[in-house]
Amino acid sequence: MVMLDTLANAMAAIVNAEMRAKPEVIIMPASKLIANVLRVMQREGYIGEFEYIDDGRWGKIRVRLLGRINKAGVIKPRFSVKYKDLIRMPDWLRKYLPSRDIGILIISTSQGVMSHREAIQRRIGGVLLAYVY
């Protein structure tokens, strides 16, 4: 089976497990990008602990769920946003989050993967990867 977008598959697995009220989910294959996105989600309080499991192939990630995710997904195409766009939240960016203060956008910047709030504090832009609320 060919996996074209591992981040989209990981986000779909998390949302499906949350909808079924599962206590944990196993994401495979693992990647550094998925681990960095999970780290941001953990810092923001959407998921619990996660651990890498080496299976000798691609690896897996076990994620403990807290039941706080209503919706999550990737943003396709992954387009760039400037710092000023993050502050103003134009209509095309507002469609991913239900409200200004609810949810996070996950952004890949030159300083690493972070939430849009952290990018605003650091005054940097980047490439939109995903949204969670």
Curated annotation (Swiss-Prot):
Gene3D superfamilies recorded: 3.30.1370.30, 3.30.1490.10
Listed InterPro entries: Ribosomal_uS8, Ribosomal_uS8_CS, Ribosomal_uS8_sf
Pfam families linked: Ribosomal_S8
Keywords, in A-Z order: Ribonucleoprotein, Ribosomal protein, RNA-binding, rRNA-binding
One Gene Ontology molecular-function label: structural constituent of ribosome
Purpose of the protein: One of the primary rRNA binding proteins, it binds directly to 16S rRNA central domain where it helps coordinate assembly of the platform of the 30S subunit.
Subunit structure: Part of the 30S ribosomal subunit.
Family from the record: Belongs to the universal ribosomal protein uS8 family.
Protein known as: Small ribosomal subunit protein uS8
